[in-house]
From Swiss-Prot:
GO terms for cellular component: mitochondrial inner membrane; respiratory chain complex I. This is NADH-ubiquinone oxidoreductase chain 4L. Its main location: mitochondrion. The chain crosses the membrane at residues 1-21, 29-49, 61-81. The keyword DNA repair does not apply.
């Protein structure tokens, strides 16, 4: 395994640890998930470039499109929650309350 692959895997792991540890604010959770998606994009692009598998060359672009959609929906939810509750604390968002 090359050094570039190891760096991408470390970036994914750090984003996952950040998501698990710092989940008090919605904005930090969204940033950690965006870091995970970008590291998956780089890993998929590197894997396809190293294996010369041209049929799967659209997969990183599709993954990037889904990451952009996820970011847009997450930011829309963040704006809605900030306007409704005044904060972006995740623990205040209990969906089971009426």
């Amino acid at each position: 395994m090359s050094l570039v692959h190891m760096n991408v895997i470390v970036a994914f792991t750090l984003s996952l640890v950040g998501l698990l540890m710092y989940r008090s604010h919605l904005m930090s959770a969204l940033l950690c998930m965006e870091g995970m998606m970008l590291s998956l994009f780089v890993l998929a692009a590197l894997t396809i470039l190293n294996s010369h598998f041209t049929l799967a060359s659209m997969m990183p672009i599709i993954l990037l499109v889904f990451a952009a959609c996820e970011a847009a929906i997450g930011l829309a939810l963040l704006v809605t929650i900030s306007n409704t509750y005044g904060t972006d604390y995740v623990q205040n968002l209990n969906l089971l309350q009426c």
